[in-house]
Design a protein with these regions (language model features):
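Membrane-interface interhelical connector segments
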Residues: 34-55, 59
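Extended, low-polarity transmembrane helix blocks
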Residues: 1-35, 57-65, 69-155
Length: 155
């Protein structure tokens, strides 16, 4: 079982997918976890998720860890499948809870609702993150990953 967790191929495409998904999620995770990049930090993020969004504390904690630690796992290629799973689940929940009702498109044009409020973001970006996460869960971290190094030592 442990060998399967670390097993991956010497694939540059997987490395690129892993690295770029990690780069995209690193600032989001650090906003929630440490308050970097203008974020609210752990306490503020927990308060927002549990208070305003009504998410149970354990799931709020897991969401913050999935983005914060998951992005680090993707950047280093350590426990890539676990990191990708956390981020994929986060994105599925985000689509369901926040973005689905806004439609497909991201609204980068600043469209407004009929009530004069900014229209929310759609879910097209999230689908890409979900697809990349699923690919990484299936194939692993690829070339230049710590998983590959560990897998080689487990043989």
């Amino acid at each position: 079982m442990i060998k399967k967790l670390f097993k991956t191929e010497n694939d540059t495409a997987l490395f690129i997918l892993r690295l770029l998904l990690g780069i995209v999620f690193f600032p989001h995770g650090m906003q929630k976890l440490l308050g970097w990049f203008g974020g609210y930090g752990f306490a503020g993020s927990m308060g927002f998720f549990t208070g305003q969004m009504g998410i149970p504390a354990i799931f709020a904690f897991l969401a913050i860890m999935a983005e914060g630690l998951g992005s680090l796992g993707l950047l280093t290629g350590l426990l890539t499948r676990v990191a990708a799973f956390g981020i994929t689940v986060n994105m599925i929940v985000a689509v369901y809870m926040v973005h689905w009702h806004n439609g497909f498109f991201m609204n980068w044009s600043g469209a407004m609702t009929s009530a004069g409020k900014p229209a929310g973001e759609g879910f097209e970006y999230h689908l890409l993150a979900i697809a990349i996460g699923i690919a990484l869960m299936i194939k692993g971290g690829g070339r230049w990953s710590l998983d590959r190094v560990i897998s080689g030592k487990l043989k």
